[in-house]
Amino acid sequence: MKGSENMANLTNHERPGIYSGYEMASVLQSGSGGKAVAIAALVSGADAGLAGEVVTLHKADGFSSESVMGQMVALALANGAYCVYAYGVKDAGAYAAAYEALLGCDNVGVLVSDASGESGLQLVRDAVVAASNDRRECVGVCGVRGAVSEQIALAQAVNSERMVLVGTTAAGEGLFAAAVGGAVAALGDVSVPLGGAELNGALPECGVFSDNEIDALVRSGVTAVESRRGVVEVVRAVTSRSKSGNGSDST
């Protein structure tokens, strides 16, 4: 009986553990060859001339290697995307047009955006939901950072099995989103969870979350990413769907 009591008193943490029914790998119906990644991000300077059009890339040579868009493209490819469709936007008002153009491209399974804030993330969500309802199955991937409570609030505002919010402690949200998006697109077997996956490419070093913070993030629909011994890895990969109606939803 004492052994049973000890087992009952164990704390169940989300690092790692039993995966929820809304694992992001289970939403994207990818084939054995993977999916293409579509990226929308602000561009300026030398890349401004490419704004407002879809650029198809199989290697990271279309945009400046120092720009956010250039780095996002490189990271998506480095993590397994076989093809990237990139659409540079000049201002916040151009994102809707970017999503419409990108989601009309061939074999897109992941839409990555550097959008931020509640309204920006919800715009991505609405775009991928509309595409999926039109039989163009895809998920959106965006980055979030800041206090754990702020990341949770954004996930709850999005609350969709079609959206993955990549939470870190470091700046460069779009970069982390692109890396995770590439890894998701590369999955040939949708039953394989992405938790614990190492991310390739030049990513900013980010901090480590406590077990309690991981619990709070994952249970609220945030995919936690952190650095350990110089390696950036996905702790748990979930979609932002955490509530159904007014109650929690982990099915």
Model-derived features: positions:
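Short, Lys/Arg-enriched N-terminal segments with co-localized hydrophobic residues
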Residues: M1-N6
